[in-house]
Swiss-Prot record:
One of its GO terms (biological process) is methanogenesis, from carbon dioxide. This is Tetrahydromethanopterin S-methyltransferase subunit C. The gene is mtrC. The keyword Metal-binding does not apply. The chain crosses the membrane at residues 19-39, 40-60, 75-95, 96-116, 140-160, 164-184, 198-218, 221-241. Keywords: Cell membrane, Membrane, Methanogenesis, Methyltransferase, One-carbon metabolism, Transferase, Translocase, Transmembrane, Transmembrane helix. It is an enzyme of class 7 (translocase). InterPro entries: THM_MeTrfase_su_C. Part of a complex that catalyzes the formation of methyl-coenzyme M and tetrahydromethanopterin from coenzyme M and methyl-tetrahydromethanopterin. This is an energy-conserving, sodium-ion translocating step. GO terms for cellular component: plasma membrane.
Length: 267
């Protein structure tokens, strides 16, 4: 089930500008490190994708708090759709500056779609344009980061051969989108908190790194794939442990329900 927020501005301890800097700087640094360093370090692309996922999840949290309803999953998928277009355009024309050009193109696409949503469709969400720019840019960085994990490079030819032509882009689309859209959907409620939502985004993005780590074995070898998977598992364990601790902090009670009763016991 998906739902929107309470119909107002989302509050949080982490400022929007800080998370934006984390997403843009962390995302680009991770992508470039994964590109320039030896294949064994392609996991840096995944770490960049994690930074971008946290930024995107916070942007979804802010815009969905105005009441998107079932649009919460849709906006996550839209982010990755815009991301694919911007990423391929940037890599095709930008060369070594491809990821930066891709982010610029994503911002333009996001701004146009946000304006259409407010001015034409009439959604009336005050931060829609800005949120769509952020979500589009975050989605682009997630696409690029996870592609670097698989291909070991953001070279356009390598991405086409190792990510697009073999269909791995569909895998990235789903797991990348889930990291951006799912955290707010899962944590939604009167006790939703920014730190719990964002640590869930880290956990989901770590799963994406693990999955793309498996996919990287086809092109980068088992050793590199093993490193990617190991790094993803470590980040996942730390994030999941923190998420569970925050659940216990925010919940009224955490109890074990035991096994479901049998039909005979219910009679």
């Amino acid at each position: 089930m998906s739902a929107g927020g309470a119909g107002g501005e989302a509050k949080g301890a982490y400022p929007q500008q800080t998370l934006m800097a984390l997403g843009i700087v962390g995302g680009l640094v991770g992508i470039y490190l994964g590109h320039f360093m030896p294949p064994a370090y392609s996991f840096f692309g995944g770490i960049g994708a994690i930074c971008a996922t946290v930024w995107g999840a916070d942007a979804v949290r802010r815009v969905a708090s105005y009441g998107l309803g079932t649009g919460v999953p849709s906006i996550g998928m839209l982010a990755l759709g815009m991301g694919i277009l911007a990423a391929l355009f940037g890599l095709a024309l930008g060369g070594i500056a491809g990821p930066i050009l891709a982010v610029v193109v994503a911002a333009i696409i996001g701004g146009v779609i946000g304006a259409l949503a407010n001015k034409v469709i009439g959604m009336g969400i005050p931060i829609m344009e800005q949120a769509m720019i952020e979500i589009s840019c975050a989605g682009t960085l997630v696409i690029l980061g996870l592609s670097v994990v698989i291909a070991g490079s953001f070279d356009y030819a390598a991405i086409i051969e190792n990510v697009i032509a073999n269909g791995y882009i569909a895998l990235i689309f789903i797991i990348g989108g889930m990291g951006i859209l799912h955290p707010f959907n899962a944590c939604l409620g009167p006790d939703e908190s920014q730190d719990r939502t964002l640590i869930l985004a880290v956990e989901k993005a770590a799963i994406a790194l693990i999955i793309t780590g498996f996919a990287s074995s086809l092109h980068e070898g088992l050793m590199t794939a093993g490193i990617n998977i190991l790094v993803g598992l470590v980040i996942w364990y730390v994030a999941f442990s923190k998420y569970y601790a925050l659940i216990k902090r925010d919940a009224y009670a955490v109890v074990g329900t035991g096994l479901l009763p049998s039909a005979e016991e219910l009679q």
